[in-house]
């Protein structure tokens, strides 16, 4: 039986810390993901966009974080869980295999903590 390598990581929107002490970590996260050699990588708290962080951090990627973090040859799938004043964030899946379908299900129990489930169907070979 062949094995499948799966990794999961809450990347905390690519920033370590909050406020003026926050540090941009998205580039380090990308380097770590490249080292995983996982077939499927599930990511939580992934930014699609954030205008304040883009203005504050000189090296903020021009791409959405899921696209930026996807190793060469991987397909990034992203769905938004929360839309805020300055941007949005959600869940992402990076996969080596072809994606058949994807959907998002809102799992929020109230409007102040938006949660979502990313469901992806793929062909594994």
Regions found by a protein language model. Give the residues of each.
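Conserved hydrophobic/aromatic beta-strand scaffold that supports enzyme active sites
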Residues: 8, 91-93, 117-121
């Amino acid at each position: 039986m062949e094995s499948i390598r799966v990794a999961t990581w809450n990347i905390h929107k690519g920033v370590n810390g909050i406020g003026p002490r926050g540090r941009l970590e998205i580039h380090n996260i990308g380097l770590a993901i490249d080292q995983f050699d996982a077939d499927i990588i599930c990511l939580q708290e992934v930014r699609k966009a954030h205008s304040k962080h883009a203005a504050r951090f000189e090296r903020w990627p021009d791409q959405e974080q899921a696209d930026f973090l996807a190793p060469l040859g991987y397909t990034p799938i992203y769905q938004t869980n929360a839309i805020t004043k300055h941007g949005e964030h959600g869940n992402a899946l990076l996969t080596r295999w072809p994606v058949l379908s994807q959907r998002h299900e809102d799992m929020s129990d109230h409007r102040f903590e938006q949660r979502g489930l990313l469901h992806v169907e793929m062909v594994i070979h």
